[in-house]
């Protein structure tokens, strides 16, 4: 039976879109603090959802809902047009629920994220940043993946050239090049980072290199520890032999299996949090 209009999916295709969510906060200068701000509010802050390097994300996001602390008036704020952000003042840090609604053509369910609002500097030179009243930025890079999107949404994501390319049999690198030549939308992040945007392919490659080096270090540590263990066992065997102590049978290595009675005791303690 043919799919209903607008619900036919592009099989075997996954498309991702990167974005950034987070917050910026800055302490008030007592000399210039606005008079209409509550006396106990020490900071002005902004929570947001943005495209990487200012990329437009409004073609796949319908609206963003921010759920603030219950002490705020109308603590659930919905923003239907970019910039997707909420600006407020306050004195405390708390968790903010961010709910992203996709355009109706996507036929996708909303995605929920959580962000911890940071008001105070952290990391190197935290005290210096506090004295200088610098902006505290706390943000995360995220990617949303659309698996087998409906055709209409696929066209939205690719700038209108997606299904035409699929019909012509283009795939992989050729399809991507054709899309870029037609001016289609892409999910490519910038090659180099800037002061405003730390996310880039260069930074990504540096992070991959760092992880590779860390993996080598861990592997070497494991190798060294195994060699030390073998040497200790050999020395222990020599001491036992010199004292005439019978050699003990080798212990079986841990198989990774949990006894049935242990599984029963653990039941109910592992799993997703209560909804």
From Swiss-Prot:
It holds the Pfam family YEATS. The keyword Nucleus applies. It is found in: Cytoplasm; Nucleus. GO terms for cellular component: chromosome, telomeric region; cytoplasm; NuA4 histone acetyltransferase complex; nucleus; Swr1 complex. Residues 9-160 form the YEATS domain. Residues 161-207, 239-275 are annotated as: Disordered. Its main location: cytoplasm. GO terms for biological process: chromatin remodeling; DNA repair; regulation of transcription by RNA polymerase II; subtelomeric heterochromatin formation. Residues 163-183 have a biased composition (Polar residues). Keywords: Activator, Chromatin regulator, Coiled coil, Cytoplasm, DNA damage, DNA repair, Nucleus, Transcription, Transcription regulation. GO terms for molecular function: histone binding. Residues 202-242 form a coiled coil. The coiled-coil domain is required for assembly into the NuA4 complex. Component of the SWR1 complex which mediates the ATP-dependent exchange of histone H2A for the H2A variant HZT1 leading to transcriptional regulation of selected genes by chromatin remodeling. Component of the NuA4 histone acetyltransferase complex which is involved in transcriptional activation of selected genes principally by acetylation of nucleosomal histones H4 and H2A. The NuA4 complex is also involved in DNA repair. Yaf9 may also be required for viability in conditions in which the structural integrity of the spindle is compromised. Component of the SWR1 chromatin-remodeling complex and of the NuA4 histone acetyltransferase complex. Belongs to the YAF9 family. This is Protein AF-9 homolog. It comes from Emericella nidulans (strain FGSC A4 / ATCC 38163 / CBS 112.46 / NRRL 194 / M139) (Aspergillus nidulans). The lineage of its organism: Eukaryota, Fungi, Dikarya, Ascomycota, Pezizomycotina. The gene is yaf9.
């Amino acid at each position: 039976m043919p799919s209903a209009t607008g619900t036919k999916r592009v099989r075997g295709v996954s498309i991702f879109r990167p974005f950034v969510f987070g917050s910026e906060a800055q302490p008030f200068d007592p000399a210039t603090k606005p008079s209409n701000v509550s006396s106990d509010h020490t900071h002005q802050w902004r929570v947001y959802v943005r495209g990487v390097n200012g990329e437009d994300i409004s073609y796949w996001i319908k609206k963003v809902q921010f759920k603030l602390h219950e002490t705020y008036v109308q603590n659930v704020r919905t923003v239907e047009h970019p910039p997707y952000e909420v600006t407020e003042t306050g004195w405390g840090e708390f968790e903010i629920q961010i709910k992203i609604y996709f355009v109706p053509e996507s036929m996708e369910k909303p995605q929920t994220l959580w962000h911890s609002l940071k008001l105070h500097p952290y990391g190197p030179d935290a005290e210096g940043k506090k004295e200088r009243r610098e902006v505290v930025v706390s943000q995360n890079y995220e990617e949303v993946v659309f698996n087998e999107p409906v055709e209409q949404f696929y066209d939205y994501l690719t700038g209108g050239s997606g299904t035409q390319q699929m019909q012509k049999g283009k795939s992989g690198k050729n399809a991507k090049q054709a899309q870029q030549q037609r001016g289609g939308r892409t999910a490519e992040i910038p090659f180099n980072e800037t002061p405003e945007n730390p996310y880039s392919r260069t930074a990504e490659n540096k992070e991959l290199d760092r992880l590779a080096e860390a993996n080598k270090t861990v592997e070497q540590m494991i190798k060294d520890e195994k060699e030390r263990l073998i040497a200790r066992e050999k020395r222990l065997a020599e001491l036992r032999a010199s004292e005439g102590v019978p050699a003990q049978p080798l212990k079986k290595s841990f198989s990774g299996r949990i006894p049935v009675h242990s599984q029963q005791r653990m039941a109910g303690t592992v799993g997703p949090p209560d909804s």
